[in-house]
From Swiss-Prot:
Organism: Homo sapiens
Its biological purpose: Substrate-recognition component of the SCF (SKP1-CUL1-F-box protein)-type E3 ubiquitin ligase complex.
Residues where N6-acetyllysine is found: K298
Primary gene name: FBXW2
GO biological process: protein modification process; proteolysis
Protein name: F-box/WD repeat-containing protein 2
Positions of the F-box domain: 54-101
Domain of life, source organism: Eukaryota
Amino acid sequence: MERKDFETWLDNISVTFLSLTDLQKNETLDHLISLSGAVQLRHLSNNLETLLKRDFLKLLPLELSFYLLKWLDPQTLLTCCLVSKQWNKVISACTEVWQTACKNLGWQIDDSVQDALHWKKVYLKAILRMKQLEDHEAFETSSLIGHSARVYALYYKDGLLCTGSDDLSAKLWDVSTGQCVYGIQTHTCAAVKFDEQKLVTGSFDNTVACWEWSSGARTQHFRGHTGAVFSVDYNDELDILVSGSADFTVKVWALSAGTCLNTLTGHTEWVTKVVLQKCKVKSLLHSPGDYILLSADKYEIKIWPIGREINCKCLKTLSVSEDRSICLQPRLHFDGKYIVCSSALGLYQWDFASYDILRVIKTPEIANLALLGFGDIFALLFDNRYLYIMDLRTESLISRWPLPEYRKSKRGSSFLAGEASWLNGLDGHNDTGLVFATSMPDHSIHLVLWKEHG
């Protein structure tokens, strides 16, 4: 049949077909199908799927498909990837969807990386790590053995852990190998801090000392406190060392000369923590880049100027109860923007720019949680039995890890958090190394470490 004649015939039969009842149309189709060969049946099969099952991801413009995908949760998206190769291709190409999914899990996102497949892989890795945290399978434990008396001073930095003991020694350990890098003879250690060249110790003998790792020699001795020195901090740029003591004072020393520059008074309890830190916000009293001195006792946190004036005045005192009915837990977090401390009422977070309380995070199901680390996304907490991870966005505990019966000092010197960058968001690389360390009754050090990804 010629093309023109065929078109005329097709128009006529179409008019007739449209005039039929539904039953007659069905009978007509059945008859035509019975007369069809393999080519016609294949054609019918291919076109029926498009007519009866509208594949919107295939038919819509890519921008509209991406917009619709943003309304689905990640688990549904992964299921949708199994529908067809086309769906998997479209869903796997939506960068924003997978970046958002990673952010919602507390992952750090580099917006400059726009490779959607990369972020999908990151999400799959992230969901595995979060499942391990939920199932108590993300960590493993180890021990450091070498001291012969109680260990009451710990400090961690860049994969190295320093331990100070009543056996008149301090040791520096490589956490990854468990090997002792340095061991030197000291006085009794109540507090320690170190860098590559030196170790600074606060002692129960009321003094502070500076030691050289390579030779073990004492290079400086700071005398002046009349009580045990419970906390030390120093800054080489300022050439300043600060110490907090059981004599209720904070002393500021010349690090290189060993002379006392100032004695800060005002505390009425043991000073258990001193912190030297750069300010990162502008306030009425400070500018970004200014160095700040914080000191804490059982009830109060005091903020001081860094100066050499005699009778230096405290700039601000923070507390959680005016009548001193609520104690602060050991461990103080200050990152230049926020001050965070735990108490029986919960975690208190102060804005350093205004000194206002930003929020109080309560954990009614678990009382008296002590603070170990605080970040943008997560907080690391613990009590006598467990180590906890809190998602600060929801203020819910997302993981816990059992702890042995460890030696918990009231000053908070015998336990600490390890690597802290993951508290600002995991990134697939920073969940390695030390999570937590504490001294044990048998004088060993108990370590909790990230387990490698399965």
